[in-house]
Amino acid sequence: MLTTCPRVWIVDDDTDDQYLFEIAFKRLVPPVEIKLLDDGEELIPALMQTSDLPNLIILDLNMPRLNGFETLKQLRQTPPYQHVPVIVLTTSSHREDQEKAARLGANGFLTKPPSMDLLLVLFGQLVQDWELS
């Protein structure tokens, strides 16, 4: 059972998307702790500096320095972060991107802009998982 509030990290270079997800999580999963990162390059160093791993990472695929695919690959190869759930986020609806993300270990895939209904369903499932863990 989750004894503290969920920790969600949003890795996206688009501040509008960061804001959308931050607001959605705060409305749907209160209380929640949000951490915003602007690029995949920042993720592993930020994880190394915390003792409280996130319960979920929302990861954009299209970022300027280190894209989401490479970030996800690094994450899945770096203990103890291999098992942190990751939902990838992209403007691309290409099946190849979804398949590649799944092969690299993504737990879910959202196309931008995600509908609020889809966010409700996804976040509701995550809250149930958090409450059971």
Region locations from a protein language model:
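Receiver (REC) domain active-site loop signature in two-component systems and cognate sites
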Residues: 63
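Conserved acidic segment of CheY-like receiver
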Residues: 5-25, 57
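His-Asp phosphorelay/catalytic-motif detector in bacterial-type signaling
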Residues: 5, 52-56, 80-85
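C-terminal output helix
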Residues: 114-125
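Acidic, metal-coordinating helix/loop segments flanking the phosphotransfer/catalytic sites
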Residues: 36-56, 120
